[in-house]
């Protein structure tokens, strides 16, 4: 074990409770350093929540990162099935068994059935487990699942007593243990058969809740006795590497802020934003369908690639062929940029997987491709069929990771209203973004026009005017403000007479404001 790993492993909280790192992505963040050493943690959840995987990954990571042998006790699956299933995650358990680093104690029921004679007793199992722990010098133990024991035997009180003996012996042996158990409801009693009464040092609850039309996995640390942890539920997903928790509450606003500007790809828009977007900012273009949001995204990505910056487009509404065709009509060759290795386009249906999986895909692609710019078209597509809280957590996860990696992000959001004012706060994303571009349709003199406005821009002067916005063969063309109209945002533009003296004063004030922000 390296010196760094030893320091990580011997993580002790301020009140003296030593913790053992699980190295499960995100878990050590929400548990403030891992699980208390020498204690038993109950992991409770309904079927399909990932309890077995979590307990097995705890052992595998202990061996892989800290060279700590482990013992896995199975009351349900056979050892051969466990070894086979682990191959999905690239874990060669058989090799670890052959090397004497892992021992699987088979306590699964006999498929031929068995007759119970006399009182139920776990003495033989406890002795076998103690022998294995001492023989392999195990530091970690996982038991999956004690619910199976209760289901096999009717004497619930006797089984509780025997499980209590098992837990007490594990504590004497000073091994850190995870015990899994079933629960009947996602938001009901902690566990079936009152298990939490005798395994009460630490309790973790895994859930797999149906929200709308999609299932969403979350994990909650109910308690870690004698030490601190983060409160509440945190989303997680199961990837090719195992359990991956998104500790959104552990994110800190410590990222650096850049004063460097990057171009939007539209010269007039850069001027409206005081010289362009800030390098590590998050931009949101919101408006009805057809207002030109994807066009702005395309120009933004093209500009990055022209400056030899890598960029990724995550598209959830249009196919690759459709995006390339539309971009080509504006003079942007996506296929050529992809062939140069500067652009990557990832298209998928929002409903193809859960938000947590989409977030994991985005993070993985960013880590692999290392772009300077990313775009998501559109966030509103991902919001379909999910709760507001789940969607907000997703947006926080994406924006937080982008800022951490100092990436400029450009997101689009499609509003429900075709014309008139619309709320950009209902989607819970307006406060998270740094710059908001509001696009909308305006009816003037019996003709339909488009309007664009820099609604918000943190830390910078920006044009407050509402400008006419056309889409031409060369891309977006932003013209002058609607000077002689008011109530454009409300969808009921009214022509007003111009006071030339007042207009001149307004122009002077605008010039002075801009000069002040540039100095």
From Swiss-Prot:
The modification Phosphoserine is found at residue 430. Keywords: ATP-binding, Biological rhythms, Hydrolase, Kinase, Magnesium, Metal-binding, Nucleotide-binding, Phosphoprotein, Repeat, Serine/threonine-protein kinase, Transcription, Transcription regulation, Transferase. It catalyses: L-seryl-[protein] + ATP = O-phospho-L-seryl-[protein] + ADP + H(+); L-threonyl-[protein] + ATP = O-phospho-L-threonyl-[protein] + ADP + H(+); ATP + H2O = ADP + phosphate + H(+). Mg(2+) 1 binds at residue 52. Mg(2+) 2 binds at residues 294, 317. The keyword Transit peptide does not apply. The interaction with KaiA enhances its phosphorylation status, while the interaction with KaiB decreases it. The modification Phosphothreonine is found at residue 431. One of its GO terms (molecular function) is protein serine/threonine kinase activity. InterPro entries: Circadian_clock_KaiC-rel (IPR051347), Circadian_KaiC_bact (IPR013503), KaiC (IPR030665), KaiC-like_dom (IPR014774), KaiC_C (IPR047222), KaiC_dom (IPR010624), KaiC_N (IPR047221), P-loop_NTPase (IPR027417). Phosphorylated on serine and threonine residues by autocatalysis. Has a 4 step phosphorylation cycle; the autokinase acts first on Thr-431, then Ser-430. When Ser-430 is modified KaiC switches to an autophosphatase mode, acting first on phospho-Thr-431 then phospho-Ser-430. ATP 2 binds at residues 289-295, 330, 450, 456-458, 460, 462, 464. It holds the Pfam family ATPase. Central component of the KaiABC oscillator complex, which constitutes the main circadian regulator in cyanobacteria. Complex composition changes during the circadian cycle to control KaiC phosphorylation. KaiA stimulates KaiC autophosphorylation, while KaiB sequesters KaiA, leading to KaiC autodephosphorylation. Clock output pathways impact the RpaA transcriptional regulator. KaiC enhances the autophosphorylation activity of SasA, which then transfers its phosphate group to RpaA to activate it. KaiB and KaiC together enhance the phospho-RpaA dephosphatase activity of CikA. Has a weak, temperature-independent ATPase activity; ATPase activity defines the circadian period. The phosphorylation state of KaiC modulates its ATPase activity and effects KaiB binding. Belongs to the KaiC family. Homohexamer; hexamerization is dependent on ATP-binding. The KaiABC complex composition changes during the circadian cycle to control KaiC phosphorylation. Complexes KaiC(6), KaiA(2-4):KaiC(6), KaiB(6):KaiC(6) and KaiC(6):KaiB(6):KaiA(12) are among the most important forms, many form cooperatively. KaiC interacts with SasA, activating its autokinase function and leading to RpaA activation. This is Circadian clock oscillator protein KaiC.
């Amino acid at each position: 074990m390296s010196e760094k790993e030893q320091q990580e492993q011997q993580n002790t909280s301020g009140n003296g409770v030593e913790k053992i790192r699980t190295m499960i992505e995100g878990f050590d963040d929400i548990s403030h350093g891992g699980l208390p050493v020498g204690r038993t943690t109950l992991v409770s959840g309904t079927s399909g929540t990932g309890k077995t995987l979590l307990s097995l990954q705890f052992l595998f990571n202990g061996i892989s990162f800290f060279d700590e042998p482990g013992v896995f006790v199975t009351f349900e699956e056979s050892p051969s099935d466990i070894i086979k299933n682990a191959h999905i995650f690239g874990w060669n358990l058989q090799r670890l068994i052959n090397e004497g680093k892992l021992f699987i104690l088979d306590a699964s029921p006999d498929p031929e059935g068995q007759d119970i004679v006399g009182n139920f007793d776990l003495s033989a199992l406890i002795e076998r487990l103690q022998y294995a722990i001492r023989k392999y010098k195990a530091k970690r133990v996982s038991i999956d699942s004690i619910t199976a024991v209760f289901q096999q035997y009717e004497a619930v009180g006797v089984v509780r007593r025997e499980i209590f003996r098992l837990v007490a012996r594990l504590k004497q042996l000073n091994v850190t243990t995870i015990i899994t158990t079933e629960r009947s409801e996602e938001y009901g009693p902690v566990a079936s058969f009152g298990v939490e009464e005798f395994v009460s040092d630490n309790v973790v609850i895994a859930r797999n809740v149906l929200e709308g039309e999609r299932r969403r996995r979350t994990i909650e640390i109910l308690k870690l006795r004698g030490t601190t942890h983060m409160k509440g539920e945190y989303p997680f997903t199961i990837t090719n590497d195992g359990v991956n928790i998104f500790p959104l509450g552990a994110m800190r606003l410590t990222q650096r802020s850049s004063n460097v500007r990057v171009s939007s790809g539209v010269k007039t828009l850069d001027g409206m934003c005081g010289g362009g977007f800030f390098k590590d900012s998050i931009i949101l273009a919101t408006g009805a369908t057809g207002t030109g949001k994807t066009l702005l995204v395309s120009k933004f990505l093209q500009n990055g690639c022209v400056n030899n910056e890598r960029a990724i487009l995550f598209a959830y509404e249009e196919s690759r062929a459709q995006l390339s065709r539309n971009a080509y009509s504006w003079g942007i060759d996506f296929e050529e940029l992809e062939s140069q290795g500067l652009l990557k386009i990832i298209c998928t249906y929002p409903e193809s997987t859960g938000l947590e999986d989409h977030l994991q895909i985005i993070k993985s692609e960013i880590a692999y491709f290392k772009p300077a710019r990313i775009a998501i078209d559109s966030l509103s597509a991902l919001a379909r069929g999910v709760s507001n809280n789940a969607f907000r957590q997703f947006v926080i996860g994406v924006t937080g990771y982008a800022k951490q990696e100092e990436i400029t992000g450009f997101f689009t959001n499609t509003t429900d209203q075709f014309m008139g004012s619309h709320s950009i706060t209902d989607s819970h994303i307006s406060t998270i973004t740094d710059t908001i571009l509001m696009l909308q349709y305006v009816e003037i003199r019996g003709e339909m026009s488009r309007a664009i406005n820099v609604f918000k821009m943190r830390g910078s002067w920006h044009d407050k005017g509402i400008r006419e916005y056309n889409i031409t063969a060369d891309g977006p063309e932003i013209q002058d403000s609607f000077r002689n109209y008011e109530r454009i945002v409300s969808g009921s533009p009214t022509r007003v007479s111009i006071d030339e003296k007042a207009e001149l004063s307004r122009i002077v004030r605008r010039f002075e404001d801009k000069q002040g922000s540039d100095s």
